[in-house]
Amino acid sequence: MADAMLDICNEDECNDTYGRIRMYQALQLKQPEGVHIPGERTVYRVMEEIGLNHRPKRKPNGITRADKEARKSDDLIKRNFTSEKPLKKCVTDMTEIKASDGKLYVSAIFDCYDLAVLGLAMDTNMRATLCEQTLDNAVKAYPALRGSILHSDRGTQYTSELYHKAIIKYGILQSMNSAGGRCHDNARSESMWARFKEELLYGRYDTTSMTVEQLKTLIWRYFISYWNNRRICSANDGLPPMVKRQQYYASLQEAA
């Protein structure tokens, strides 16, 4: 079993962040030939024996700032970040990363159903155009996103006229944090950014020695290739987002 665990860690550089739960789920998903999969406690013990220790988490700070005078939308999520179907309830946010030649702002839309990244955009500024581009990319990739709920904080980018017009154009139902900007009101997005930085950046890359373009390539590959398709997600019962999504649509075909 130790060899199977090491094989899992070697498949992707970010797999070394797996704790006992995700390692157990990865073993269950892959079912290595000739390997008996024991309980989580045994998995944890073996991980300790072979030096696969999970790194501690760090909490990133939010970067958007609320505009108290701007248009607001109701909180349609109310901290319920679950969804029974894809493309019905989503969250969006942005984060900041320091590079050698400036700052890179990363904006994404996550699906509450399986935590898939539906839209991703990056730029050296955090203006509303970045959020608009993220939404454009998401709808282009997933036209059925029209009519879904899209939740954000009350940052000036999300209360801007430009973003509001994009929301209307695509028939999206805009949702925002409740008055007062409580941190838990957009906890899903903040959690995703924390996981991204913990797995890809902290202790692995010195981003201040990398250019913006190098970071863009690294982040695109992480989210679109690894996060969506290969990363074990405990919230999905150990399934990568796109695997859970494929199973959902397959079940619809079987029921038809």
Please report, for each region that a protein language model flagged, where it lies by residue.
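Residue-level detector of anion-binding/catalytic polar loops
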Residues: N53, I172-L173
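An active-site-proximal beta-strand-loop segment
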Residues: R79-L118, T124-A128
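C-terminal domain-tail junction helix/linker
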Residues: I168, A194-A256
